């Protein structure tokens, strides 16, 4: 049985989580924790959040029965939770709206963010434009190359995009730079972290804002079928879209839950981003979790065809769920994700993000082992517009 009251008062999920940061950030984090504790059950705050999610984001989004995909595969019925239909094209806005409302109540005038695929950067720039914040987004220079359309969207929205050229020039390096910025500007700046990683209270706060995914999906599946789904599947980078779907189902023991990491070119090659499957516990970005690191504890470079899964750590609640066995974590490699991307596009006319394609790929494998009376909810965490250049390049086409 999962304890719903996690994390504890110190931000721990079992041995994971916590607040491993420089002394200069402890006060800012305590201030944030105090504000979140105050507002998370405040009716005015929750009412404003609900209104923004409904009128601005477009929630609730549908739970779509992928009839043609299910028929093509044979086996379980596949339902897609359509986070791709949100304003800005992914689940990220569920969280940035919540944190922006918190920043407003805390009197902050500037927001910063890190981004990998660019979706969190776009979602942060979007809420900054809406609420009148100055906005700076840190993004690895490698990811800037992969996600040029999202970079342009951020700039259109009025954000400054800062290229990060250190390390692997991807998400972990962008996160490092954002933390450095925050240390220097704690008084006027709110750091909008995009995933369920980072120091306490971020893993809890982001989970709570993303849990709307699972709350809606649970009610929608009950309405459509009269029962709970047999399985849930979501991709896991930092893990916010996954925990958002999983959290409201954790105590439903009849529901199998699968998190899908980026297997890259194959786990055996070392070129992947599967920290839960191939990593070990350590400390990164302010929390204890599973990491991809060498024998000296140095964080390894990672690889995935999808920029949003290209991260060497994972949210601490996922680490806890792995150890307890409540969630089973699998890896899908680049080519399997690409195959699923094409199959969903051709059968349903839905172009998924490459991140989400990892979840679709595992759901296809899983569905084949199940009966036609059973069902799987897949979190379609984002749409694939941002990935057109990557997919075209794989196909040998320049656009």
Curated annotation (Swiss-Prot):
Catalytic activity: (1S,2R)-1-C-(indol-3-yl)glycerol 3-phosphate + L-serine = D-glyceraldehyde 3-phosphate + L-tryptophan + H2O
Subunit details: Tetramer of two alpha and two beta chains.
Single annotated GO MF: tryptophan synthase activity
Residues with PTM N6-(pyridoxal phosphate)lysine: 92
Protein function: The beta subunit is responsible for the synthesis of L-tryptophan from indole and L-serine.
The name this protein goes by in its record: Tryptophan synthase beta chain
Keyword terms: Amino-acid biosynthesis, Aromatic amino acid biosynthesis, Lyase, Pyridoxal phosphate, Tryptophan biosynthesis
GO cellular component: cytoplasm
Record-stated family: Belongs to the TrpB family.
E.C. designation(s): 4.2.1.20
Pathway(s) this gene product operates in, as recorded in its UniProt entry: Amino-acid biosynthesis; L-tryptophan biosynthesis; L-tryptophan from chorismate: step 5/5
PROSITE patterns for this protein: TRP_SYNTHASE_BETA
Cofactors that this protein relies on: pyridoxal 5'-phosphate
Domain of life: Bacteria
Entries under InterPro entries matching the protein: Trp_synth_b_CS, Trp_synth_beta, Trp_synth_beta/beta-like, TrpB-like_PALP, TrpB-like_PALP_sf
